[in-house]
């Protein structure tokens, strides 16, 4: 069952925590894309259904166990509804099951873009940004990386249609993002 007759392009953003996924999504939004942040969709559900003391990542794992590995993708497509955007972006894809679910629901104009940044740079960013799910301890950040890899994020990164390396300054990262976006919009 497809939710949209796809004449749009869909970008699935993946990458390890702190790699720059959200920055890429923000740049795409500035270009007029509809952006859905997958973790926000999960957080919305978490606020209603989480068990006392349950971590967000554990809640997401439980959702997958109950509803299948593509559940977060389905929830995100439901959140999308009907869209009149030429470009739709899902920020935070973590498994091939999610990729397959997006393709099943949205058609073949789906492109995976991985944002890559070396671990030392990512850890420094995460310590500086201090999101609620970030830790100040390197050991905790390494543990989180391992959890993400167990979910299958490495497989999604390996299957990426495009990879943006985020190891320089913001202007260079922005240039690389624009280059990849232009390629997706032009050719796919």
Swiss-Prot record:
User: Which cysteine-cysteine pairs are annotated as disulfide bonds in the entry?
Assistant: none
- Provide the alphabetized UniProt keywords: ATP-binding, Nucleotide-binding
Which residues does UniProt call coiled coil?
Answer: none
Provide the binding site for ATP. Answer: 15-22
| Cross-referenced Gene3D superfamilies | P-loop containing nucleotide triphosphate hydrolases
Which GO MF terms does the UniProt record name?
ATP binding
State a single Pfam family of this protein.
AAA_18
Q: Which family does it belong to?
A: Belongs to the UPF0200 family.
Annotated protein name in UniProt? UPF0200 protein YG5714_1176
What organism is this sequence from?
Saccharolobus islandicus (strain Y.G.57.14 / Yellowstone #1)
